[in-house]
A protein has these predicted regions:
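Small/polar/charged residue-enriched interaction surfaces, especially the RNA/DNA-contacting tracks
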Residues: 1-207
Length: 207
């Protein structure tokens, strides 16, 4: 079995919110939280990162001369028995994903900003429409890990190119990030010998 571990390092370039329906006493649209060693820690689900990567992969696959039949990121909208590279890499209702993405725990402090809803018809603030949103501010850093199982060369090319494309893709509620690939990534030699993969890694390497 071929296993590659790709470490992603993110820096927020435009304030970032990942909306959730969980209850919060501080914000109407908070980050998800988990308690670790008695402390509440905000995190970004790995499924969120995976969804963004899938969106990027769909958009750029043709640049790598890869055929795409599945243009949705929602499992319920995917037809069964699809075998294009998107479903092979990211999974489908009848197909396991070849990648697992860990949740990204946030070391940086979040901030809460108050907003007001605007009446689209009259372009004025709606009465009693104040709401609070929890953001990760500009300059905040976080990371996560992608475990890749038995990827073909084409699949690894597409995955790494999709990571690069994340620099231009909306992250959460209109956020933007800069993403780099960590030096401590573990990528087998069979991938490093590929010129396209080597070029992407060279451009994306952190530091």
């Amino acid at each position: 079995m071929s296993l590659a571990i790709i470490k992603l390092n993110f820096e927020v370039k435009k304030k970032l919110n990942i909306g959730t329906k969980m209850k919060s006493t501080k914000a109407d649209i908070p980050f998800k939280k988990v308690t670790i060693n008695g402390k509440e820690v905000a995190y970004i689900p790995g499924s969120t990162v995976k969804g963004i990567l899938r969106t990027c992969a769909i958009r750029i696959a043709n640049l790598l001369n890869l055929k795409v039949d599945s243009y949705s990121v929602y499992p319920s909208e995917l037809r069964r028995n699809k075998s294009d590279i998107i479903c092979e890499l990211f999974g489908a209702p009848d197909k396991n994903s070849k990648i697992i993405i860990d949740d990204a725990y946030l070391d940086s402090n979040t901030e809460i900003l108050t907003h007001v809803r605007i009446d689209d018809k009259y372009q004025v603030a709606k009465e009693g429409s104040l709401f609070k949103v929890e953001y990760l501010p500009i300059g905040s850093k976080f990371g996560c890990e992608i475990k890749c199982y038995n990827l073909s060369i084409d699949e690894m090319r597409l995955l790494l190119a999709s990571v690069a494309e994340m620099n231009y893709e909306r992250f959460g509620k209109a956020g933007l990030v800069e993403v780099k690939i960590g030096k401590n990534s573990q990528i087998p030699e069979l991938y490093l010998n590929d010129s396209i993969i080597k070029e992407i890694l060279g451009a994306m390497k952190d530091g």
